[in-house]
Amino acid sequence: MTPTLTDTAASFSRRGLGVLRTAGAVIGGLGLAGIAAGGAALAWGSIERTMPTLRRYDVPIERDVPEVTILQIADLHLFAGQEFLLHFLSDVASSERFDMVVATGDNFGSLDAFDMVMDAYRPFLSYPGAFVLGSNDYYSPIPKPWTRYLMRSTPPPARVVPDLPYLPMVRQMRDAGWVDLSNASGTLSLPGGTVSLLGTDDAHIFRDR
């Protein structure tokens, strides 16, 4: 059997956002009809975000490289009422086979979500892992009205003082042996060999170096 690298990505992004972008591009020229379409798209986005998805990707690699299965966890944006995501992640941890975990940030959906975030990751911390942070690990989300898609608006001033408890989260992940790849490199030892990793902090908030 030819070795391949199997990248198993657990993506919890809102698939409805694709619909939102399409509707948003049309709304400006449709007046009230466009607003109605936008409302329908937003409603679908609200429904579909409750349906997390496990996606699988096969990445071809060199013949002599051992097969590795990577679980990626991204964009949880956790807040009260999303306990279904914790159940989903627990099911993934117990039913899927993977060799290592990569967490790519944006874990918080509210200021008080720290316990939920750590509960989400607890089933995975016994695996080799690495992580980077996203803007919603440093700064809590700012609610935005959907009408902002209809008109130009002045962007809010950039925040420079984090208000989310990212340091305790980072500490617990490091204590579990996970590698912090925020503007850093590192390695993970797997049964099939050593994996070299390189990461950056979030470029959208100018923390990459």
Q: Which residues does each PLM region occupy?
A:
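A mature extracytoplasmic/lumenal domain signature
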Residues: 135, 192, 199-201
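Core catalytic region of metal-dependent phosphoesterases/phosphodiesterases
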Residues: 84-189
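N-terminal active-site segment of His-dependent metallophosphoesterases
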Residues: 35-119
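Charged, low-complexity N-terminal segments of organelle-associated membrane proteins
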Residues: 1-10
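Catalytic-adjacent loop/helix segments of enzymes that bind and process anionic phosphate/sulfate esters
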Residues: 197-209
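Beta-strand-turn-beta hairpins that frame and shape the catalytic cleft
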Residues: 58-71, 178-179, 185-197
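Short hydrophobic segments within beta-strands
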Residues: 73, 104, 132, 198-200
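Hydrophobic alpha-helical topogenic segments used for membrane insertion/localization
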Residues: 13-44
